[in-house]
Amino acid sequence: MLNRTILVGRLTRDPELRTTQSGVNVASFTLAVNRTFTNAQGEREADFINIIVFKKQAENVNKYLSKGSLAGVDGRLQTRNYENKEGQRVYVTEVIADSIQFLEPKNSNDTQQDLYQQQVQQTRGQSQYSNNKPVKDNPFANANGPIELNDDDLPF
């Protein structure tokens, strides 16, 4: 028997993190997954699938994913049931995730800004050890006319 589910979609809400009585972290969220075909109006419909994830991965999901985040989920399909306050039997189908892939950075603007700041700091650090000479952006900025190069001057 095989019970394997692989999904890629966007979160419809922020993950909800809770802890069981035995101390296990559990996160839940809903993933919107587009169908591969279009309806009569030419629009793609989506399925909204409940996802449950446990332990350390639940903490990571809560920390790094939010509404609108693109995520990949690998897990198994599970149906559970319970009796509601009115005495009716309620069935819930959800995916129990074995693995969650974060398919985009939490905030790409922050990440790009951090990388830029690191590069600036590295450049400043290098200039301290090169006789404090400023690095010119364009070494040919003061050239008056064409620059002559021979094939022997090229490193390739």
Curated annotation (Swiss-Prot):
Disulfide bonds: none
SUPFAM superfamilies associated with the record: Nucleic acid-binding proteins
One cellular component (GO) term of this entry: nucleoid
Molecular-function GO terms, alphabetical: single-stranded DNA binding
Domain SSB: 1-104
Residue ranges with Low complexity bias: 112-128
Pfam families with a match to the protein in the record: SSB
Record-level GO BP terms: DNA recombination; DNA repair; DNA replication
Motif Important for interaction with partner proteins, residue range(s) on this chain: 151-156
PROSITE patterns assigned to the protein according to its UniProt record, in alphabetical order: SSB (PS50935)
Claim: DNA damage is one of the keywords in the record: yes
Keyword terms of this UniProt record: DNA damage, DNA recombination, DNA repair, DNA replication, DNA-binding
Family annotation (InterPro entries): NA-bd_OB-fold, Primosome_PriB/ssb, ssDNA-bd
Region annotated Disordered, chain positions: 104-156
HAMAP family: SSB
Biological role stated in the UniProt entry: Plays an important role in DNA replication, recombination and repair. Binds to ssDNA and to an array of partner proteins to recruit them to their sites of action during DNA metabolism.
Subunit and partners: Homotetramer.
Descriptive protein name: Single-stranded DNA-binding protein 1
Species in which this protein is naturally found: Staphylococcus aureus (strain Mu50 / ATCC 700699)
Lineage, broadest ranks: Bacteria, Bacillati, Bacillota, Bacilli, Bacillales
